Amino acid sequence: MTEIDYYLVDVFTSLKYGGNQLAVFVDFKNEISTENMLNIARELNFPEITFIKENQYDKIFNVRIFTPEYEVPFAGHPSLGTAFIISKYLLPKPKKSIILNLKHSNITIDLTSINDIDKSYFIMEQAQPDFITTYKHQEIANGLGIQLEVLNIQKPIEEISTGLPYIIIPVINLEKINQVKLDSRKVIEFLTLNKKYKTNSLTGLSTSLFFITDETFDKSNSFNTRMFCIENGNLIEDAATGSANGCFLAYLLKNKSTEISAIVEQGFQMERKSYIHLDGKIENNKYSLKVGGQVVDVSKGKWKV
């Protein structure tokens, strides 16, 4: 029986058992089939897991990302967590930048320190945003079954993607975002009606919901956020979502200022505090979307295939 090395990390946190969980599998011999990669994702039931499939001369690493439902072309916290494992365990010595070859595109991840990987910030440059569509506030309130007064009607509701699609939904304050409760059937109906569900979307992926407010638990942070998605027919909340925050950064650059630096808190309502650092600007009509955070080493082991 073959055994594969795997590692567990928490991403977007400096403390173990905070942030978002990730399992990283090292499969340079391609011994795990696509079917079994999905089976492993379902067995662990983490938001995502990754498989490092190839090391191209210590410069580019081919990586595949799976949720318990399907393979995804890009995801934020899995990219950062995988770069951490590569830096700490797979390279002869850490490098200032790592390139991950993902299904959607190549992602470059920079390290703020190569001398102390455990304290380094891992920062990814996300792809150019696709501003897909906007929604009326009443349409979102009716479609998701929430009260209109929960929404900040002074700010637009917009669907954006840098590899995965999210609807950015501004909420009036922290109290209201804490109280957000969604029904999975209602969300699936809304997504299906708008051709945003996996069964009828152009990409075969379901669009997720990203609620944001500029009131925070920790006053040193800039925004509080919550991300909800449908997975295997169930409504799931995510503790820290790098891809959603990249879309949110694009949203801020488009609607607020052409240069942004911010710290986003996420997962606070789940008791998994996460801190996502955003730095972005628009220059020559191009978006620079940098999303970063720290990664904590949790455990490692062997997986029997």
Predicted features along the sequence, with ranges:
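Active-site proximal loop and beta-alpha junction motif in alpha/beta enzyme cores
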Residues: 1-74, 80-305
